[in-house]
């Protein structure tokens, strides 16, 4: 569904085309910003890892201790990974686990995941091409040419610029949450851009956006994938909650984070997909019965997803 998030922000991108770009290394997957997967471009991956890696490592310390991942083990694992992937040899996580076992390094489950995240943050590995439905790892230096890296101050400013261009209007706390940076760093990034940004006060909070850009009204319907940027990229998500949003929610299955139906900028329900080789079924669970106009726009959103999933 991550590829569907890309398609929603592209012109007629299909699942096959998105997969092809990923396999070719035009889009990479790694742990950046926060301790979770993100798609990044080859041009951005190194400076993003250098900027956000230290904060991610700090978040990982508890699980490292819990699963016995220490500096000595990481050094041994890095050597095994570098040898195993050398020469364009793309391996799955299970295959790398077998390589570790061959070198008498016993690690699995969350501990293995921790080791591989550290390898990503070290700029040792990144995503390789898919093998069927399985993800592989590649050596970053073989996948992405080395180049100049932004210094820390410039990197914070550039990340702020990217965020508010694509997510504004938003607050400094929104940017801090999304980027994983401290609130102090987030505010410094905003301040460094000076006249590039304008701001407005709404309900007691200061919202920043690109100067000269008028926030557009969101009209229409979209079927968003789980953990879509429209909902999770903000510390305060109250502005997308409509009047029909369920008041009592299970935090483990919060509709904000699942596949949501978005109508005119507000959450209006959830949806599910069932895919076969010839068919893409979409099941809707609206929070309330939509009006006729909303039903028509939701139907168009369903058709767009079907076209994405089925077109070659």
Label for each model-derived stretch:
Residues 1-239, 243-312:
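Long, low-complexity intrinsically disordered regions
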């Amino acid at each position: 569904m991550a590829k569907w998030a890309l398609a929603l922000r592209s012109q007629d991108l299909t699942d096959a085309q998105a997969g092809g770009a990923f396999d070719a290394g035009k889009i990479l997957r790694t742990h950046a910003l926060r301790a979770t997967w993100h798609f990044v471009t080859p041009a951005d991956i190194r400076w993003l890892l250098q900027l956000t890696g230290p904060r991610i490592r700090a978040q990982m310390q508890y699980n490292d201790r819990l699963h016995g991942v220490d500096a000595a083990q990481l050094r041994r694992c890095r050597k095994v990974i570098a040898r195993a992937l050398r020469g364009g040899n793309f391996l799955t996580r299970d295959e790398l686990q077998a390589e570790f076992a061959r070198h008498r390094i016993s690690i699995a489950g969350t501990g293995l995941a921790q080791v591989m995240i550290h390898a990503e943050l070290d700029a040792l590995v990144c995503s390789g091409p898919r093998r069927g439905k399985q993800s592989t790892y590649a050596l970053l230096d073989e996948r992405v040419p080395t180049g100049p890296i932004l210094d820390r101050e410039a990197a914070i400013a550039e990340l702020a610029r990217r965020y508010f261009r694509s997510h504004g209007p938003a607050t400094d706390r929104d940017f801090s949450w999304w980027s994983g940076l401290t609130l102090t760093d987030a505010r410094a990034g905003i301040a460094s851009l000076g006249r590039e940004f304008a701001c407005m006060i709404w309900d007691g909070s200061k919202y920043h956006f690109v100067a000269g850009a008028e926030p557009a009204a969101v009209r229409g319907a979209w079927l968003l994938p789980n953990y879509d940027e429209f909902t999770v990229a903000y510390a305060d998500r109250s502005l997308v909650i409509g009047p029909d949003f369920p008041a009592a929610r299970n935090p483990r299955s919060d509709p904000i984070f699942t596949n949501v139906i978005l109508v005119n900028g507000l959450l209006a329900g959830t949806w599910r997909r069932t895919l076969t080789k010839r068919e893409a079924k979409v099941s809707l669970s609206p929070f309330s019965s939509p009006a006729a106009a909303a039903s028509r726009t939701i139907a168009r959103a369903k058709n767009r997803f079907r076209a994405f999933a089925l077109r070659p």
